[in-house]
Amino acid sequence: MKYIYELESVKVHRLSLVDKFYMEWIKSLIDFYFYGQKEEAVARLEKILSQLSVPDLTYLQVSNTLFNFYYDIEDLESFNEIREKLEYQVNQLNLKTIEELNLSIKFNYNVCRYLWLQNNTEEAITKITDTIKQCKTYRTTYLLADLYLLMGNVSKNFSSKVAVKEYFETAYFLYKLEGNMSMALKIEHYIADITE
């Protein structure tokens, strides 16, 4: 991503306004994850958001990234504030395009993950179940393997080994279907640990 950004940034003066926002968004991801310049990345995304209109899909995608950044830098006040706004806005989407559907699933997955990390097990299970149902309703496998993996992780401390193994096996099957052998092998390791 860094390499592609560097190639494209040379042409930034010829880009449309939306494409310039997109380039700034990519730069924020690179700064945050590659260079560790987290505060600068957050400030850049906040600036981008101030220049976009709220219902715009780019606004929601950038907000979703900022949502993740706030959690990662442990700014939980801003995290919860943006979560409420994003949850409302994502729920208003018509889900008539792949981009809208994927954004909805991605945001819901992120919420599920953070609920799990905060040990809010019951709410995490409800949200994961609802998001899996959404994937099935719209016949998409986007993040479905990740959702089943997350359900296995959420339930492994209290659910039966058989149930947890089923979640992991479903995730394993979906990762193999996607050709994601790295994750499939990791899941295979989890399954082996459960059966021992």
Residue map of PLM features:
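Residue register of alpha-helical TPR repeats
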Residues: 22, 61, 99-106, 146, ...
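Structural register within alpha-helical repeat arrays
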Residues: 27-29, 66, 111, 144, ...
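Single-residue signature of alpha-solenoid repeat helices
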Residues: 3, 40-41, 79, 124, ...
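Residue signature of alpha-solenoid helical repeat architecture, marking inter-repeat boundaries
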Residues: 16-20, 57-60, 98-102, 142, ...
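Amphipathic alpha-helical segments of tetratricopeptide repeats
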Residues: 4-12, 45-53, 84-96, 129-140, ...
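Structural motif corresponding to the intra-repeat A-B loop/turn of tetratricopeptide repeats
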Residues: 34-35, 73, 111, 118, ...
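Flexible inter-repeat linkers and adjacent short helices
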Residues: 1-40, 51
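Residue at a conserved register position within TPR or TPR-like alpha-solenoid repeats
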Residues: 31-32, 70, 108, 115, ...
